[in-house]
Regions:
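Intrinsically disordered, low-complexity acidic Ser/Thr-rich regulatory segments
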Residues: 90-115
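Mid-to-C-terminal alpha-helical segments outside catalytic/metal-binding sites
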Residues: 147-170
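Active-site environment of divalent metal-dependent phosphoester hydrolases
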Residues: 4-11, 27-30, 59-63, 137-139
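Short acidic/histidine-rich active-site segments
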Residues: 55-57, 124-146
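Histidine/acidic residue-rich metal-binding segments in metalloenzymes
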Residues: 1-21, 35-51, 112-127
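Conserved, mostly hydrophobic/aromatic
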Residues: 24, 53, 134, 169
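Aromatic-lined glycan-binding groove of carbohydrate-active enzymes
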Residues: 39-95
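Extended C-terminal subregions enriched in glycine
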Residues: 52, 58, 101-110, 120-123
Length: 170
């Protein structure tokens, strides 16, 4: 239900006989007005349903500042296109890395992902939050220190530091 409107979300919960999954959404609490994320009320209702919200790692899903600065990210995409590349091309990686160094303020970080996890845990408990990443859908807007699955140890470290147990994380 990660791509549905708020009203459709509530309609789904009314008719669903099974727990519902938001496979790649985050908390609107941190991104007021960003409709793709879930409000606290939606998250609470999802918990009552037995469902799970899996946190999206895209910058615009994690932080309002990243959404404001998306025009700068658009300039990176235009640069890559001008060179006949996409963000998934290995030849683009040095360009992306340099861009990230020059514009670090545009990217969120692992701590912000953990903030979203913390928020869901406070609202509905650890059993209702997961990792949705959206690695294949958010382009080069992934958090610093969490650019691909090989960076998961960075997130695990932050969660352990915040008091989560290995069992919580599993």
């Amino acid at each position: 239900i990660s791509h549905v409107s708020d009203s459709t979300f509530y309609d789904v919960l009314k008719i669903s006989k099974a727990p519902v999954i938001a496979s790649h959404s985050s908390c609107r609490f941190f991104t007021p007005g960003f409709q793709r994320n879930m409000s606290d009320d939606m998250i609470r209702e999802l918990g009552k349903n037995g469902g799970v919200i899996q946190i999206n790692f895209g910058a615009s899903f994690l932080d309002s500042l990243a959404r404001v600065n998306s025009k700068v990210l658009d300039s990176l995409e235009k640069l890559l296109i001008s060179k006949g590349l996409t963000s998934r091309d290995s030849a683009a990686q040095p360009i992306i890395d340099q861009f990230a160094m020059n514009h670090a303020e545009l990217y969120s970080d692992v701590d912000r992902v953990a903030d979203h996890i913390d928020h869901v845990v406070r609202l509905i408990g650890i059993d209702h939050v997961g990792i949705g990443s959206d690695f294949d859908g958010v382009g080069d807007s992934l958090p610093l220190g969490l650019k691909d699955v090989s960076d998961y140890p960075n997130l695990i470290f932050v969660l352990l530091k915040r008091g989560y147990t290995p069992e919580d994380i599993e």
